[in-house]
């Protein structure tokens, strides 16, 4: 062993630390999954702010109806999708399993559910746009159906990955908890 002031111990070249300085795999995985989920939550926050801005602009009549269409019915319950993301963020500091489970279930209910309903709600108008090339709602000159379907595709991917990574994180925390209980 080396001392602060003295010479290095004989037979040691300083590379004998690798067997001692390892972080357990489940801690690495937990940290990386938390990081991925946080990125997805921030992406969800951007989508949420875009939808909220569109709703505010149309309801407050800040611009004409020709520029920003009135919101669809699925957009109102989708605004509640911020709550599951907050539960997910609150679960991270102390590895709170119950908050993460609440986040996963309510993400399906408040995020994926309205998106599925929105797909069904807008399908007849999308069909009309495809068949006849006529759109009646616009967002800054683009067909509102096309814009909202694009937003929905991105949102479904974000929420799907969020649920997937949350499940993997939950499994990681749960196996770690079970190992502690066995000891």
Curated annotation (Swiss-Prot):
UniProt keyword Transport present: yes
Topology within the bilayer: Multi-pass membrane protein
Annotated source species: Xenopus laevis
Function of the molecule: Endoplasmic reticulum transmembrane protein involved in vesicle-mediated transport, which is required for neutrophil function.
Top-level taxon: Eukaryota
Stretches that traverse the bilayer: 40-60, 72-92, 100-120, 138-158
Predominant cellular place of this UniProt entry's protein: endoplasmic reticulum
Entries under InterPro entries matching the protein: Jagunal
Membrane-side (Lumenal) residue stretches: 61-71, 121-137
Gene: jagn1
Record topological domains on the Cytoplasmic side: 1-39, 93-99, 159-183
One CC-aspect GO term: endoplasmic reticulum membrane
Family classification: Belongs to the jagunal family.
Listed GO biological process terms: defense response to fungus; endoplasmic reticulum organization; granulocyte colony-stimulating factor signaling pathway; neutrophil differentiation; neutrophil mediated immunity; neutrophil migration; protein transport; vesicle-mediated transport
Protein name: Protein jagunal homolog 1
Pfam families referenced in this protein's UniProt entry, alphabetically: Jagunal
């Amino acid at each position: 062993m080396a001392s602060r002031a003295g010479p290095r111990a004989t037979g040691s070249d300083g590379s004998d630390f690798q067997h001692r300085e390892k972080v357990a795999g489940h801690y690495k995985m937990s940290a990386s999954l938390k990081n991925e989920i946080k990125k997805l939550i921030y992406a969800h926050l951007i989508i949420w702010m875009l939808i909220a801005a569109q709703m505010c602009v149309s309801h407050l009549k800040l611009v004409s109806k020709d520029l920003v269409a009135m919101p669809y019915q699925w957009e109102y319950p989708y605004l509640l999708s911020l709550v599951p993301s907050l539960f997910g963020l609150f679960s991270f500091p102390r590895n709170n399993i119950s908050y993460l489970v609440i986040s996963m279930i309510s993400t399906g209910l408040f995020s994926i559910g309205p998106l599925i309903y929105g797909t069904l709600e807008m399908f007849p108008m999308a069909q009309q746009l495809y068949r006849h090339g006529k759109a009646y709602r616009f967002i800054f000159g683009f067909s509102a159906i096309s814009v909202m379907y694009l937003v929905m595709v991105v949102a479904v991917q974000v929420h799907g990955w969020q649920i997937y990574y949350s499940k993997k994180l939950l499994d990681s925390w749960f196996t770690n908890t079970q190992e502690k209980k066995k000891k």
